[in-house]
Protein backbone atom coordinates (compact mmCIF):
# COMPACT_ATOMS: atom_id res chain seq x y z
CA UNK A 1 0.00 0.00 0.00
CA UNK A 2 1.10 3.58 -0.62
CA UNK A 3 2.59 5.59 2.25
CA UNK A 4 1.77 9.04 0.92
CA UNK A 5 -0.43 10.29 -1.93
CA UNK A 6 -0.31 13.71 -3.55
CA UNK A 7 -3.73 14.90 -4.72
CA UNK A 8 -3.40 16.86 -7.96
CA UNK A 9 -6.76 18.56 -7.64
CA UNK A 10 -8.84 20.92 -5.52
CA UNK A 11 -12.19 21.41 -3.82
CA UNK A 12 -14.68 18.67 -3.06
CA UNK A 13 -12.90 15.92 -4.98
CA UNK A 14 -9.64 16.60 -3.13
CA UNK A 15 -11.55 16.29 0.15
CA UNK A 16 -13.16 13.04 -1.04
CA UNK A 17 -9.74 11.57 -1.80
CA UNK A 18 -8.37 12.77 1.56
CA UNK A 19 -11.20 10.91 3.33
CA UNK A 20 -10.39 7.72 1.43
CA UNK A 21 -6.69 8.05 2.26
CA UNK A 22 -7.48 8.56 5.93
CA UNK A 23 -9.50 5.32 5.93
CA UNK A 24 -6.48 3.56 4.44
CA UNK A 25 -4.06 5.33 6.83
CA UNK A 26 -2.23 6.98 3.93
CA UNK A 27 -0.70 10.44 4.41
CA UNK A 28 -1.93 13.14 2.02
CA UNK A 29 -0.32 16.04 0.20
CA UNK A 30 -2.39 18.88 -1.26
CA UNK A 31 -1.28 21.23 -4.00
CA UNK A 32 -2.95 24.59 -4.37
CA UNK A 33 -3.05 27.86 -6.27
CA UNK A 34 -2.12 30.98 -4.31
CA UNK A 35 -5.75 32.11 -4.26
CA UNK A 36 -6.78 28.92 -2.43
CA UNK A 37 -4.15 28.78 0.30
CA UNK A 38 -6.83 28.94 3.03
CA UNK A 39 -9.22 26.46 1.39
CA UNK A 40 -10.71 23.55 3.29
CA UNK A 41 -8.92 20.88 1.25
CA UNK A 42 -5.55 22.52 1.98
CA UNK A 43 -6.29 22.54 5.70
CA UNK A 44 -7.45 18.92 5.72
CA UNK A 45 -4.33 17.50 4.03
CA UNK A 46 -1.28 16.47 6.05
CA UNK A 47 0.98 18.65 3.89
CA UNK A 48 0.38 21.30 1.26
CA UNK A 49 2.47 22.96 -1.45
CA UNK A 50 1.70 26.01 -3.54
CA UNK A 51 2.23 25.15 -7.20
CA UNK A 52 1.51 28.47 -8.86
CA UNK A 53 -0.55 31.66 -9.08
CA UNK A 54 -4.33 31.86 -9.23
CA UNK A 55 -5.20 30.58 -12.70
CA UNK A 56 -5.72 26.86 -13.30
CA UNK A 57 -3.27 26.94 -16.20
CA UNK A 58 -0.51 28.18 -13.90
CA UNK A 59 -1.30 25.92 -10.95
CA UNK A 60 -3.50 22.82 -11.21
CA UNK A 61 -2.30 22.24 -14.79
CA UNK A 62 1.35 22.90 -13.88
CA UNK A 63 2.71 19.40 -14.47
CA UNK A 64 6.29 20.17 -13.48
CA UNK A 65 5.32 22.05 -10.32
CA UNK A 66 3.02 19.25 -9.18
CA UNK A 67 5.67 16.61 -9.81
CA UNK A 68 8.23 18.68 -7.92
CA UNK A 69 5.84 18.88 -4.95
CA UNK A 70 5.37 15.10 -5.08
CA UNK A 71 9.10 14.46 -5.06
CA UNK A 72 9.82 17.02 -2.34
CA UNK A 73 7.11 15.59 -0.12
CA UNK A 74 8.18 11.99 -0.60
CA UNK A 75 4.85 10.92 -2.07
CA UNK A 76 4.83 7.59 -3.86
CA UNK A 77 1.62 8.11 -5.83
CA UNK A 78 -0.47 10.88 -7.39
CA UNK A 79 -4.26 10.87 -7.49
CA UNK A 80 -5.48 13.24 -10.23
CA UNK A 81 -9.17 13.34 -9.23
CA UNK A 82 -11.24 14.47 -12.21
CA UNK A 83 -10.66 17.32 -14.64
CA UNK A 84 -7.31 19.11 -14.84
CA UNK A 85 -4.65 16.37 -15.40
CA UNK A 86 -6.85 13.33 -14.74
CA UNK A 87 -6.88 12.24 -18.40
CA UNK A 88 -3.54 13.73 -19.42
CA UNK A 89 -1.41 10.99 -20.96
CA UNK A 90 1.68 13.21 -20.89
CA UNK A 91 1.32 13.73 -17.14
CA UNK A 92 0.73 10.02 -16.52
CA UNK A 93 3.93 9.24 -18.44
CA UNK A 94 5.85 11.91 -16.52
CA UNK A 95 4.70 10.34 -13.25
CA UNK A 96 6.01 6.95 -14.38
CA UNK A 97 9.34 8.46 -15.40
CA UNK A 98 9.65 10.04 -11.94
CA UNK A 99 8.98 6.72 -10.21
CA UNK A 100 5.51 7.79 -9.06
CA UNK A 101 2.33 5.74 -9.43
CA UNK A 102 -0.34 7.58 -11.38
CA UNK A 103 -3.66 6.40 -9.92
CA UNK A 104 -5.31 5.58 -13.20
CA UNK A 105 -4.57 3.57 -16.35
CA UNK A 106 -1.28 3.65 -18.20
CA UNK A 107 -0.43 6.62 -20.40
CA UNK A 108 -0.85 4.58 -23.60
CA UNK A 109 -4.42 3.63 -22.65
CA UNK A 110 -5.30 7.20 -21.69
CA UNK A 111 -3.91 8.39 -25.02
CA UNK A 112 -5.98 5.88 -26.99
CA UNK A 113 -9.24 6.69 -25.23
CA UNK A 114 -8.71 10.46 -25.06
CA UNK A 115 -8.87 10.58 -28.86
CA UNK A 116 -12.62 10.21 -29.37
CA UNK A 117 -12.33 9.17 -33.01
CA UNK A 118 -9.67 6.54 -32.18
CA UNK A 119 -11.75 5.28 -29.24
CA UNK A 120 -14.78 4.79 -31.48
CA UNK A 121 -12.67 2.97 -34.04
CA UNK A 122 -11.46 0.68 -31.25
CA UNK A 123 -15.06 0.10 -30.10
CA UNK A 124 -16.07 -0.88 -33.65
CA UNK A 125 -13.21 -3.38 -33.74
CA UNK A 126 -14.54 -4.90 -30.50
CA UNK A 127 -18.02 -5.23 -31.99
CA UNK A 128 -19.53 -2.44 -29.91
CA UNK A 129 -22.03 -0.21 -31.79
CA UNK A 130 -21.11 3.46 -32.22
CA UNK A 131 -23.08 6.41 -33.56
CA UNK A 132 -22.84 6.60 -37.39
CA UNK A 133 -19.90 8.78 -38.39
CA UNK A 134 -17.04 9.28 -36.01
CA UNK A 135 -14.24 9.36 -38.58
CA UNK A 136 -11.62 12.09 -38.30
CA UNK A 137 -11.94 14.82 -40.93
CA UNK A 138 -9.13 15.63 -43.34
CA UNK A 139 -10.31 19.03 -44.57
CA UNK A 140 -13.40 21.18 -45.15
CA UNK A 141 -14.35 19.34 -48.34
CA UNK A 142 -14.18 16.04 -46.49
CA UNK A 143 -16.41 17.59 -43.82
CA UNK A 144 -19.14 18.52 -46.31
CA UNK A 145 -18.98 15.13 -48.02
CA UNK A 146 -19.37 13.20 -44.76
CA UNK A 147 -22.17 15.50 -43.56
CA UNK A 148 -24.09 14.83 -46.78
CA UNK A 149 -23.59 11.09 -46.36
CA UNK A 150 -24.85 11.14 -42.76
CA UNK A 151 -27.73 13.54 -43.40
CA UNK A 152 -28.54 16.57 -41.26
CA UNK A 153 -28.67 17.25 -38.38
CA UNK A 154 -25.12 16.24 -37.44
CA UNK A 155 -22.88 16.77 -34.43
CA UNK A 156 -19.44 18.31 -34.95
CA UNK A 157 -17.06 17.39 -32.12
CA UNK A 158 -13.48 17.98 -31.06
CA UNK A 159 -11.43 14.76 -31.05
CA UNK A 160 -10.03 15.50 -27.61
CA UNK A 161 -13.11 17.29 -26.28
CA UNK A 162 -14.68 17.01 -22.87
CA UNK A 163 -16.62 18.91 -20.25
CA UNK A 164 -19.17 20.07 -22.80
CA UNK A 165 -16.61 22.00 -24.86
CA UNK A 166 -15.92 21.62 -28.54
CA UNK A 167 -19.24 20.31 -29.86
CA UNK A 168 -22.15 21.74 -31.85
CA UNK A 169 -25.38 20.47 -33.39
CA UNK A 170 -25.56 21.61 -37.02
CA UNK A 171 -28.71 21.54 -39.13
CA UNK A 172 -27.48 22.74 -42.54
CA UNK A 173 -24.50 23.08 -44.84
CA UNK A 174 -24.44 26.81 -44.07
CA UNK A 175 -24.15 26.17 -40.32
CA UNK A 176 -21.48 23.56 -40.96
CA UNK A 177 -19.28 25.95 -42.93
CA UNK A 178 -19.79 28.71 -40.36
CA UNK A 179 -19.05 26.55 -37.30
CA UNK A 180 -16.20 24.38 -38.60
CA UNK A 181 -13.38 26.83 -37.99
CA UNK A 182 -14.96 28.13 -34.77
CA UNK A 183 -14.98 24.63 -33.29
CA UNK A 184 -11.44 24.02 -34.49
CA UNK A 185 -10.28 27.18 -32.73
CA UNK A 186 -12.21 26.30 -29.56
CA UNK A 187 -10.63 22.85 -29.59
CA UNK A 188 -7.17 24.30 -30.19
CA UNK A 189 -7.50 26.63 -27.21
CA UNK A 190 -9.14 24.16 -24.83
CA UNK A 191 -7.38 20.91 -25.77
CA UNK A 192 -4.27 22.04 -27.70
CA UNK A 193 -5.46 20.00 -30.69
CA UNK A 194 -7.86 21.17 -33.40
CA UNK A 195 -8.81 17.75 -34.82
CA UNK A 196 -12.59 17.35 -35.17
CA UNK A 197 -15.01 14.66 -36.34
CA UNK A 198 -18.65 14.34 -37.41
CA UNK A 199 -21.34 12.00 -36.22
CA UNK A 200 -25.08 11.64 -36.71
CA UNK A 201 -27.20 13.66 -34.29
CA UNK A 202 -29.65 11.54 -32.28
CA UNK A 203 -32.59 13.75 -31.22
CA UNK A 204 -34.25 11.63 -28.52
CA UNK A 205 -31.39 9.74 -26.90
CA UNK A 206 -30.71 9.15 -23.23
CA UNK A 207 -27.25 9.24 -21.65
CA UNK A 208 -26.51 5.94 -19.88
CA UNK A 209 -23.13 5.03 -18.43
CA UNK A 210 -21.50 1.96 -16.87
CA UNK A 211 -19.07 2.14 -13.95
CA UNK A 212 -16.25 -0.38 -14.18
CA UNK A 213 -13.18 -1.34 -12.16
CA UNK A 214 -10.41 -3.57 -13.49
CA UNK A 215 -7.28 -4.80 -11.74
CA UNK A 216 -3.77 -5.64 -12.96
CA UNK A 217 -4.86 -9.20 -13.79
CA UNK A 218 -7.74 -8.12 -16.01
CA UNK A 219 -10.40 -9.00 -13.44
CA UNK A 220 -13.39 -6.83 -14.31
CA UNK A 221 -16.04 -5.55 -11.94
CA UNK A 222 -19.16 -3.90 -13.31
CA UNK A 223 -20.30 -1.59 -10.54
CA UNK A 224 -23.66 -0.53 -11.87
CA UNK A 225 -25.06 2.03 -14.26
CA UNK A 226 -26.19 5.64 -14.12
CA UNK A 227 -28.41 7.93 -16.13
CA UNK A 228 -27.06 11.42 -16.79
CA UNK A 229 -29.48 12.70 -19.44
CA UNK A 230 -30.20 16.04 -17.77
CA UNK A 231 -27.48 18.26 -19.21
CA UNK A 232 -26.97 21.89 -20.18
CA UNK A 233 -24.56 22.47 -23.03
CA UNK A 234 -23.43 18.84 -22.65
CA UNK A 235 -22.56 19.34 -18.96
CA UNK A 236 -24.36 17.10 -16.50
CA UNK A 237 -26.74 18.71 -13.99
CA UNK A 238 -28.61 15.73 -12.48
CA UNK A 239 -27.36 12.14 -12.22
CA UNK A 240 -29.14 9.00 -11.07
CA UNK A 241 -28.29 5.42 -10.16
CA UNK A 242 -29.45 3.04 -11.39
CA UNK A 243 -30.74 4.02 -14.84
CA UNK A 244 -34.42 3.44 -14.10
CA UNK A 245 -35.40 3.33 -17.77
CA UNK A 246 -33.57 0.02 -18.32
CA UNK A 247 -35.38 -3.30 -18.24
CA UNK A 248 -33.38 -6.31 -16.94
CA UNK A 249 -32.67 -7.64 -20.44
CA UNK A 250 -31.52 -4.20 -21.62
CA UNK A 251 -29.20 -3.87 -18.62
CA UNK A 252 -27.78 -7.31 -19.36
CA UNK A 253 -27.14 -6.31 -23.00
CA UNK A 254 -25.46 -3.09 -21.86
CA UNK A 255 -23.15 -4.93 -19.48
CA UNK A 256 -22.24 -7.40 -22.22
CA UNK A 257 -21.14 -4.48 -24.40
CA UNK A 258 -19.04 -3.17 -21.52
CA UNK A 259 -17.42 -6.58 -21.05
CA UNK A 260 -16.72 -6.86 -24.79
CA UNK A 261 -15.03 -3.48 -24.91
CA UNK A 262 -12.98 -4.00 -21.74
CA UNK A 263 -11.76 -7.39 -22.97
CA UNK A 264 -9.64 -5.58 -25.54
CA UNK A 265 -8.03 -3.13 -23.10
CA UNK A 266 -5.08 -3.60 -20.74
CA UNK A 267 -6.91 -1.30 -18.36
CA UNK A 268 -6.20 -0.72 -14.66
CA UNK A 269 -8.46 1.21 -12.30
CA UNK A 270 -11.83 2.91 -12.37
CA UNK A 271 -13.45 3.88 -15.63
CA UNK A 272 -16.80 4.90 -17.04
CA UNK A 273 -18.20 3.75 -20.37
CA UNK A 274 -20.67 6.28 -21.74
CA UNK A 275 -23.45 5.32 -24.15
CA UNK A 276 -26.40 6.94 -25.87
CA UNK A 277 -29.58 4.86 -25.67
CA UNK A 278 -32.30 5.33 -28.27
CA UNK A 279 -34.65 3.04 -30.16
CA UNK A 280 -33.67 0.08 -27.93
CA UNK A 281 -30.06 0.45 -29.13
CA UNK A 282 -26.93 1.43 -27.18
CA UNK A 283 -24.25 3.47 -28.96
CA UNK A 284 -20.80 3.84 -27.41
CA UNK A 285 -19.84 7.49 -26.89
CA UNK A 286 -16.55 7.48 -25.01
CA UNK A 287 -14.69 6.12 -22.02
CA UNK A 288 -13.65 8.36 -19.16
CA UNK A 289 -10.44 6.98 -17.67
CA UNK A 290 -10.87 8.53 -14.24
CA UNK A 291 -13.10 9.00 -11.23
CA UNK A 292 -16.38 10.63 -12.26
CA UNK A 293 -17.98 13.66 -10.62
CA UNK A 294 -21.10 11.53 -10.16
CA UNK A 295 -19.38 8.49 -8.64
CA UNK A 296 -21.18 8.94 -5.32
CA UNK A 297 -24.61 7.91 -6.66
CA UNK A 298 -23.09 4.55 -7.52
CA UNK A 299 -21.57 4.28 -4.06
CA UNK A 300 -24.97 4.91 -2.50
CA UNK A 301 -26.82 2.23 -4.47
CA UNK A 302 -24.13 -0.48 -4.60
CA UNK A 303 -22.42 0.02 -1.24
CA UNK A 304 -19.03 0.24 -2.97
CA UNK A 305 -16.36 2.71 -1.87
CA UNK A 306 -15.06 3.60 -5.31
CA UNK A 307 -12.24 5.92 -4.27
CA UNK A 308 -10.81 3.59 -1.63
CA UNK A 309 -10.96 0.64 -4.02
CA UNK A 310 -9.43 2.71 -6.81
CA UNK A 311 -6.43 3.45 -4.60
CA UNK A 312 -6.11 -0.18 -3.48
CA UNK A 313 -6.17 -1.47 -7.07
CA UNK A 314 -3.54 1.08 -8.10
CA UNK A 315 -1.38 -0.30 -5.28
CA UNK A 316 -1.74 -3.83 -6.68
CA UNK A 317 -4.81 -5.25 -4.95
CA UNK A 318 -6.60 -8.05 -6.80
CA UNK A 319 -10.39 -7.97 -7.06
CA UNK A 320 -12.81 -10.72 -7.98
CA UNK A 321 -14.89 -10.34 -11.15
CA UNK A 322 -18.47 -9.42 -10.34
CA UNK A 323 -21.55 -7.52 -11.40
CA UNK A 324 -22.85 -5.33 -8.59
CA UNK A 325 -26.46 -5.35 -7.47
CA UNK A 326 -28.47 -2.26 -6.59
CA UNK A 327 -30.34 -1.33 -3.46
CA UNK A 328 -32.64 1.66 -3.76
CA UNK A 329 -32.37 4.69 -6.03
CA UNK A 330 -29.97 7.63 -5.67
CA UNK A 331 -30.08 11.10 -7.21
CA UNK A 332 -27.35 13.72 -7.33
CA UNK A 333 -27.76 17.36 -8.30
CA UNK A 334 -24.93 19.77 -8.98
CA UNK A 335 -25.38 23.08 -7.21
CA UNK A 336 -23.45 25.48 -9.44
CA UNK A 337 -22.50 29.13 -9.24
CA UNK A 338 -24.20 29.53 -12.60
CA UNK A 339 -27.45 31.49 -12.47
CA UNK A 340 -27.48 31.76 -16.27
CA UNK A 341 -26.06 29.63 -19.04
CA UNK A 342 -22.24 29.68 -19.16
CA UNK A 343 -22.11 32.57 -16.68
CA UNK A 344 -19.95 31.92 -13.62
CA UNK A 345 -21.05 33.90 -10.58
CA UNK A 346 -18.25 34.99 -8.26
CA UNK A 347 -18.17 36.54 -4.82
CA UNK A 348 -18.56 35.54 -1.18
CA UNK A 349 -20.86 32.82 0.10
CA UNK A 350 -22.41 35.03 2.77
CA UNK A 351 -24.86 32.25 3.67
CA UNK A 352 -24.34 28.58 2.86
CA UNK A 353 -26.42 26.02 4.72
CA UNK A 354 -27.47 22.66 3.33
CA UNK A 355 -30.04 20.11 4.47
CA UNK A 356 -28.47 17.60 6.87
CA UNK A 357 -30.65 14.73 5.61
CA UNK A 358 -28.67 14.48 2.37
CA UNK A 359 -25.13 13.46 1.50
CA UNK A 360 -23.26 16.62 0.60
CA UNK A 361 -19.89 16.86 -1.16
CA UNK A 362 -18.47 20.38 -1.16
CA UNK A 363 -15.17 22.18 -0.86
CA UNK A 364 -16.73 25.39 0.43
CA UNK A 365 -17.84 26.83 3.76
CA UNK A 366 -19.96 29.82 4.63
CA UNK A 367 -17.82 32.91 4.13
CA UNK A 368 -15.64 31.39 1.39
CA UNK A 369 -15.07 33.11 -1.94
CA UNK A 370 -16.17 31.67 -5.29
CA UNK A 371 -13.24 32.59 -7.53
CA UNK A 372 -13.37 33.21 -11.30
CA UNK A 373 -10.50 30.85 -12.13
CA UNK A 374 -12.12 27.43 -11.69
CA UNK A 375 -15.34 25.53 -12.42
CA UNK A 376 -18.79 26.51 -11.20
CA UNK A 377 -19.46 23.55 -8.90
CA UNK A 378 -20.30 24.61 -5.34
CA UNK A 379 -21.70 21.34 -3.99
CA UNK A 380 -23.11 17.96 -4.93
CA UNK A 381 -26.29 17.09 -3.06
CA UNK A 382 -27.27 13.41 -2.97
CA UNK A 383 -30.23 11.45 -1.65
CA UNK A 384 -31.18 7.78 -1.65
CA UNK A 385 -34.61 6.22 -1.18
CA UNK A 386 -36.20 2.81 -1.90
CA UNK A 387 -37.77 4.04 -5.19
CA UNK A 388 -37.00 6.71 -7.77
CA UNK A 389 -40.14 8.71 -7.07
CA UNK A 390 -39.40 8.71 -3.34
CA UNK A 391 -35.86 9.90 -4.10
CA UNK A 392 -37.18 12.74 -6.28
CA UNK A 393 -39.57 13.80 -3.51
CA UNK A 394 -36.79 13.76 -0.91
CA UNK A 395 -34.50 15.79 -3.18
CA UNK A 396 -37.31 18.28 -3.63
CA UNK A 397 -37.52 18.70 0.16
CA UNK A 398 -33.74 19.01 0.46
CA UNK A 399 -33.54 21.76 -2.14
CA UNK A 400 -36.32 23.71 -0.46
CA UNK A 401 -34.18 23.85 2.68
CA UNK A 402 -30.96 25.01 1.00
CA UNK A 403 -29.97 28.48 2.17
CA UNK A 404 -27.40 30.18 -0.02
CA UNK A 405 -26.77 33.85 -0.67
CA UNK A 406 -24.02 36.19 -1.81
CA UNK A 407 -23.81 34.75 -5.32
CA UNK A 408 -26.23 33.56 -7.98
CA UNK A 409 -26.74 29.82 -8.42
CA UNK A 410 -28.76 27.29 -10.41
CA UNK A 411 -30.82 26.39 -7.32
CA UNK A 412 -34.08 27.69 -8.88
CA UNK A 413 -33.52 25.44 -11.92
CA UNK A 414 -32.86 22.40 -9.72
CA UNK A 415 -36.05 23.04 -7.77
CA UNK A 416 -37.99 23.45 -11.02
CA UNK A 417 -36.67 20.15 -12.39
CA UNK A 418 -37.64 18.15 -9.30
CA UNK A 419 -41.21 19.48 -9.48
CA UNK A 420 -41.82 18.78 -13.16
CA UNK A 421 -44.35 15.99 -13.83
CA UNK A 422 -42.34 14.92 -16.89
CA UNK A 423 -39.17 14.53 -14.82
CA UNK A 424 -40.99 12.76 -12.01
CA UNK A 425 -42.39 10.35 -14.62
CA UNK A 426 -38.84 9.87 -16.03
CA UNK A 427 -39.83 11.17 -19.48
CA UNK A 428 -36.48 12.76 -20.28
CA UNK A 429 -33.71 12.72 -22.86
CA UNK A 430 -30.42 14.57 -23.36
CA UNK A 431 -32.26 17.62 -24.78
CA UNK A 432 -34.79 17.86 -21.95
CA UNK A 433 -33.11 20.80 -20.20
CA UNK A 434 -32.38 22.67 -23.42
CA UNK A 435 -36.09 22.62 -24.26
CA UNK A 436 -37.00 23.54 -20.68
CA UNK A 437 -34.85 26.67 -20.46
CA UNK A 438 -34.67 27.56 -24.15
CA UNK A 439 -30.95 26.98 -24.62
CA UNK A 440 -29.54 26.87 -28.12
CA UNK A 441 -27.76 23.60 -28.80
Name each model-derived stretch:
Residues 107, 116-117, 161-165, 328:
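Conserved A3 ("GATE") glycine/threonine-rich loop of ANL adenylate-forming enzymes
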Residues 152-159:
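Conserved anion/nucleotide-ligand pocket segment
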Residues 166-169, 176:
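Conserved glycine-bearing catalytic or ligand-binding loops at nucleotide- and phosphate-handling centers
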